[in-house]
Swiss-Prot record:
Disulfide bonds join C44-C85, C124-C168. Keywords: Cytoplasm, Disulfide bond, Endoplasmic reticulum, Glycoprotein, Immunoglobulin domain, Repeat, Signal. InterPro entries: Ig-like_dom (IPR007110), Ig-like_dom_sf (IPR036179), Ig-like_fold (IPR013783), Ig_Fc_receptor (IPR050488), Ig_sub (IPR003599). This is Fc receptor-like B. It comes from the Eukaryota. The gene is Fcrlb.
Amino acid sequence: MWMLAALLLLVPRSGKAATLEKPVLTLHPPWTTIFKGERVTLRCDGYHPLLLELRPISTLWYLGHVLLPSHKKSIEVQAPGVYRCQTRGAPVSDPIHLSVSNDWLILQVPYAAVFEGEPLVMRCRGWYDKVVYKLHYYHDGQAVRYFHSSTNYTVLQARASDSGHYQCSGTMRIPVESAPMFSSKVAVTVQELFQTPVLRTLSPQEARGRVVLRCETRLHPQKRDTPLQFAFYKYSRPVRRFDWGAEYTVPESEVEELESYWCEAATTSRSVRKRSPWLQLPGRGPVLDLASTTAPVAQAAALGPGDKPLSFRKTPVSRSVQSVTSIPNSTFAGLQFPAGHVATAGPHACAPLPASAEQSREALQPKVDLLLREMQLLKGLLSRVVLGLKDPQALHELTETPETPNSHVTVNPATPETTVMEGRVDS
């Protein structure tokens, strides 16, 4: 009867067997590297059902693929390897890698995963706690911190860029001060707390006829209870500051500029902040975004608490070419622009020119022709002045030929005719 009651505790109302979460394996002290001869304690925390057995087995321990003889909740170990545990009816726990060293100097890092925004603590430890002097910490071969004697190195708010290989060096007095000694390199990985957010529009059914934007992201499974806040921006202007809601309703007056929106997700302490790419509407290609040329959106790098993103975003202009329009210009006629691509300082195209503009263009044509002829004469004059400076004798010979252009030009503004006055350049 009691056995039946115990089994019923594991069967929910749906009739399906309950799925138990895997147990949590912890290490004390919390360092993955120890000196030879030292011992550490492993503890397995999980669900332990009350089974009516004479000798209930509540915990299983594994070293690699070998089953250890102990069935206690905690065990002491000193052998290197990969440890796991399992409770009755639950999956196997995540592993803990334990290293044992016989060096004079070891670098100890936490066994548990370190997530973005959390402190990352490392300890450079001398043989059986001897004091380490002239202590240096290295990240991927570069010195990042110096201490006079034994001190932990702490990164207050870890970032993905803090991942890599760490090492330490220093001296010890055994009994006199030794030469600098180096620890082995240790790999450290900073886990992503949540993914880079993506801004999307809700379907008309979900939005109930409105235009609603949703900032979507996903937390790491081990941190799924971490609260996040969201902010929405239009260009670089915040339209809704950080709040718990992941949705924002766009005003009707701004619906035409949806592609200028982006969002940001952050923890409540703002220790981790990540911005989304610009909103991409279905069926449209990438929008002109000058900011992305200097900082690719793919990284969507996490912003610091004080960072203010800038935007140089412009409204896109259609690239379809249907016809060619001739646009008059006060300084040069005949400039050709594809229809819809007339010169403009704003995002909207100019309106078609009226018939009076065409008449104005015809009136300006003689003046433009006159200006072109004057420019040709001035070009010839300047070329001869330059030739005279370089070779006066050659210029003297050219001025005696009947084809020599005149060097003095006057223009009668009343007519489009050009009056030429004879003259010559003295060599």
